[in-house]
């Protein structure tokens, strides 16, 4: 190393300072993961060099044998990790080691809770592995030179993790990056060959290039020259996905997942598959155990790592899976694609369409298997990713039935409010003669559970699915049936229970409707433009009145979403239904004063709107009418 020039001291980005604080104060009980993170980064740097060297072979000059070396110095209390990958320029070093250049950083920092386990997961999925060096080191030095630049353009970065870092230009003979960790007091155990070897075997055996350590040597006899330093490869150094499934242990699959997903937890499930024939490719797909913080940002980077004939081509290749599977991590290695493939080409290539279709089915099969064989694990999956899976029927018509089978709902079968009922379970419990799947959407579980719309269903013992996620009404607009049974929104249109109503019931309903024609006309006149129709209800057993949605009208949930986003909402008026057996309706029918009849009608209308979760257009008028009624009753 020559003399340092252009030396400057810079401050870390605020978010990095916060992260370093968490690292330095030992966020992790499992400190040895620092080595896994640094090796993972070095592996990525070598992958990038391999890819760039396809079009610029001269980048490999001075060392075509790509590898990672880990060494230590017990006396100096240091651990050094070196790769001969792509390397970094001065600008790269300042950008990558001084800031987090990622969208969603502010959201990420907000999500840090102070709970060590949760925070370690978040930091892992955010991909800030380099900073984990500060778990064991009180000073970190980085020496780097980008491939293709002269030796005089090396860079030296140094920091104690206390808010600032130094960066200087130095001579560096070889391309690539060397990281020197100056271990904290009490962390000397890591300056040991046996310890480092075990950590590499445990966490990084799957890395597809050699990781070398100095060979253990017997001490030189007195007067003898110490033996020349020899290196030995301590990992398997083959791409894990290229090995037969029978030869890969679960622990290896789990560690490989942590490498590709930058996660600190084991995956929930995985699927490893080799396809031969017309198309030839290998896929290794993982479902994480927990949702990333940016799951609901549909434009956030996503996708699989793409390799072509085991050469890394790109991260986050999003063309292989639909958007509703953006939580899936993993690798796809194709023999049919060109090495100079671009994102634009991926979007148009018919080979990709075939692979996407097959990989989508593979993920759905993996989820079906998980739901069937490990329902508790699937419950965890649903809690984390259920709302994203609900985007599926709109995006993926071909797999609509398969996706519908994976959906889970709360229902009137219990009071837990837990989304645990599958459509298959619902149909297995259906009443004899029931040929429909009944559901109700609303803003909250408490609101839908107590909705008057459910009264007739409770009376007849018919289960109703309770849908309260913001996406649910939109979802149901894309689901027309499941297993040949149509979906029916119990708050929409004229409720027809089909075979579940006896002929006597139907006849009685017709007679009551005829008998109440006079009341219907009076209510129409009183409510005027507020309603599209007034009719006798077949839904109610306990409540006096209810508002139903017109068959073609937009539901309340969807209306509220559009209004909140400032979009124009089509005009629609509810249907006012009343329960002729309710004492209040009897009193209303007998009311002689049309003014009082009008006030009572509007009170019933507003109460029905509130019960449906809607807000009143004129709350002051409702309060005025109610107060007037209370005064009359108290006289």
Swiss-Prot record:
B: region residues: 344-560
One Pfam family named in its UniProt record: HATPase_c_3
GO molecular function: ATP binding; ATP hydrolysis activity; ATP-dependent protein folding chaperone; unfolded protein binding
Keyword Chaperone appears in the UniProt entry: yes
Localization (cell): Cytoplasm
Keyword Secreted: no
Region: C, residue numbers: 561-635
Primary subcellular site in the record, as a coarse category: cytoplasm
Region described as A: 1-343
Swiss-Prot/TrEMBL keywords: ATP-binding, Chaperone, Cytoplasm, Nucleotide-binding, Stress response
Subunit structure: Homodimer.
Function noted in UniProt: Molecular chaperone. Has ATPase activity.
Family: Belongs to the heat shock protein 90 family.
Name the record gives this protein: Chaperone protein HtpG
Organism lineage: Bacteria, Pseudomonadati, Pseudomonadota, Gammaproteobacteria, Pseudomonadales
Gene expressing this chain: htpG
């Amino acid at each position: 190393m020559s003399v340092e020039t252009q030396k400057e001291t810079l401050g870390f980005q605020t978010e990095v300072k916060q992260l370093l604080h968490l690292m330095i104060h030992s966020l992790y009980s499992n400190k040895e993961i620092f080595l896994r993170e640094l090796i993972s980064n070095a592996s990525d740097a070598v992958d990038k060099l391999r890819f760039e060297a396809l079009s610029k072979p001269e980048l490999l000059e001075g060392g075509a044998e790509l590898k990672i070396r880990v060494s230590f110095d017990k006396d100096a209390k240091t651990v050094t990790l070196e790769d001969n990958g792509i390397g970094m320029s001065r600008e790269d070093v300042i950008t990558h080691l001084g800031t987090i250049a990622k969208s969603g950083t502010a959201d990420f920092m907000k999500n840090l809770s102070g709970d060590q386990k949760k925070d370690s997961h978040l930091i892992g999925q955010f991909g800030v592995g380099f900073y984990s060096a500060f778990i064991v080191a009180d000073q970190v030095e980085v020496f780097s030179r980008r491939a293709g630049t002269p030796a005089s353009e090396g860079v030296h970065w140094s920091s104690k993790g206390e808010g600032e870092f130094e960066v200087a230009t130095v001579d560096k003979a070889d391309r690539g990056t060397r990281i020197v960790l100056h271990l904290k007091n009490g962390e000397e155990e890591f300056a040991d060959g046996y310890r480092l070897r075990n950590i590499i075997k445990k966490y990084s055996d799957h890395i597809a290039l050699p990781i070398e350590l100095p060979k253990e040597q017997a001490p030189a006899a007195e007067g003898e020259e110490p033996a020349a330093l020899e290196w030995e490869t301590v990992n398997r150094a083959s791409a894990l996905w290229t090995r037969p499934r029978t030869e890969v242990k679960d622990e290896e699959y789990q560690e490989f997942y942590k490498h590709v997903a930058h996660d600190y937890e084991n995956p929930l499930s995985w699927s490893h598959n080799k396809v031969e024939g017309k198309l030839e490719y290998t896929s290794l797909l993982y479902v994480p155990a927990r949702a990333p913080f940016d799951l609901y940002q549909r434009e956030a980077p996503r996708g699989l790592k793409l390799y072509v004939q085991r050469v890394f081509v790109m991260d986050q290749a999003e063309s292989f899976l639909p958007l509703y599977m953006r939580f899936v991590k993993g690798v796809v290695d194709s023999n049919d694609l060109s090495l100079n493939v671009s994102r634009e080409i991926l979007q148009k290539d018919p080979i990709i369409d075939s692979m996407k279709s097959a990989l989508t089915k593979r993920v759905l099969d993996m989820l079906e298997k998980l739901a069937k064989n490990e329902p508790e694990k699937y419950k965890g999956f649903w809690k984390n990713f259920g709302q994203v899976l609900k985007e599926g029927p709109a995006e993926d018509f071909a797999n609509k039935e398969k996706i519908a089978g994976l959906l889970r709902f709360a229902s009137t079968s219990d009071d837990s409010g837990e989304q645990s009922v599958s459509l298959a379970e619902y149909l297995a419990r259906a009443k004899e003669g029931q040929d429909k799947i009944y559901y109700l959407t609303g803003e909250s579980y408490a609101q839908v559970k107590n909705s008057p719309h459910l009264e007739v269903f409770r009376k007849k013992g018919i289960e109703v699915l309770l849908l309260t996620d913001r996406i649910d009404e939109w979802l149901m607009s894309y689901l027309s049936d499941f297993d040949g049974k149509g979906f029916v929104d119990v708050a929409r249109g004229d409720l027809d229970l089909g075979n579940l109503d006896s002929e006597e019931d139907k006849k009685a309903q017709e007679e009551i409707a005829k008998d109440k024609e006079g009341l219907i006309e009076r209510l129409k006149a009183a409510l005027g433009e507020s309603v599209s129709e007034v009719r006798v209800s077949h839904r109610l057993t306990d409540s006096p009145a209810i508002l139903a949605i017109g068959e073609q009208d937009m539901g309340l949930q969807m209306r509220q979403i559009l209004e909140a986003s400032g979009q124009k909402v089509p005009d629609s008026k509810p249907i006012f239904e009343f329960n002729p057996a309710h004492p209040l309706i009897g009193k209303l029918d007998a009311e002689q004063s049309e003014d009082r009849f009008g006030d009572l009608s509007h009170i019933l209308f507003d109460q029905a709107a509130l019960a449906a979760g809607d807000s009143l257009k004129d709350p002051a008028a409702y309060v005025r009418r109610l107060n007037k009624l209370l005064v009359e009753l108290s006289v």
